[in-house]
Amino acid sequence: AAFTLWGADLRRDFTRNRMRRFGQACVVACELPDDIDRLHAHFLHTPASVTRYAAIMRGLPWSGSAHAKDIWTTPKWDIREKLGCLDWLVTCTQSGADYLRTLAPDPETVSLVHHGLDFSRFAPPDACEHMSDTPNTPLIILSVGRAVPKKGYNDCLQALASLPPHLDWRFRHVGGGPLLNELRDRAHGLGLEDRIEWLGAQPQGVVLSEIRRADVFVLPSKQTPDGDRDGLPNVLMEAQSQRVAVLSTRMSGIPELILDGETGVLVTPGDSAALSDALCRLLEDPALRAKLAQAGLERVRSHFSM
């Protein structure tokens, strides 16, 4: 049965990846201990395909989790097939859940479970400590994320280059990724190299320290041509947990966390002019930053804490 199912999938997706998935499923099915009662796939693309085939080979029920790229870049026919034979699936954004339910034979199969933040690990700083009498000079704009197209860092650099010259700021980026050298070159071309520090990938402790010293956190997420996009980036919750004003985009599940003008600021994805205007407002208005930072902390604590 699994071989027949895989053959039907292969006719629609004749790729090495599809061939490899069946081989991986054979290994899983052969090596699986006898006391396993259920298989669970943590992503809806390759892991779910392997799990689906292996579950059929072993006669086991299976379930799944879905996040972002695996939802938006997996073909609809493939999602329909998987949702039609698993027991249940959880996903972490309302936008993802709504989309998956349109493809599920039974929409009740799909459940929403937002990611949560452990406040024992991300305890917020004291309000007086964060809003000291000696604010950062220059003001610090921080972003944490991989240097990949969906993070929108080209838009971010253009927005930074468009800021009024009287503003005194520095941009700090934490994260690795394949576009890092390209972004450095673009920053140089825009004349920003003296205002930007690229820190590369860092352990969580360093990331948390960087967040705590920031005045504004920015993540200009966008959709790429192949449909890839963020879901609800955990780093936005982490930034808000540290009383930092957050600026992002109306992308996927981000508006489920950030209420524009109330707990942060949202702009249209890919709109570098709007991003620059929003950054300018935040940099020029410490009272607005403090208001949004406190409201963001309260929303994360009340709606997204574990």
Write out the residue ranges for each language-model feature:
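Carbohydrate-associated surface elements
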Residues: S95, G116
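Short hydrophobic beta-strand element within catalytic cores of glycosyltransferases
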Residues: L236, S241, A245-S248, I258
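Nucleotide-activated donor-binding/catalytic signature segment of Leloir-type glycosyltransferases, i.e.
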Residues: V174, N181-G205
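Acidic donor-binding loop of glycosyltransferase active sites
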Residues: R212-R229, V244
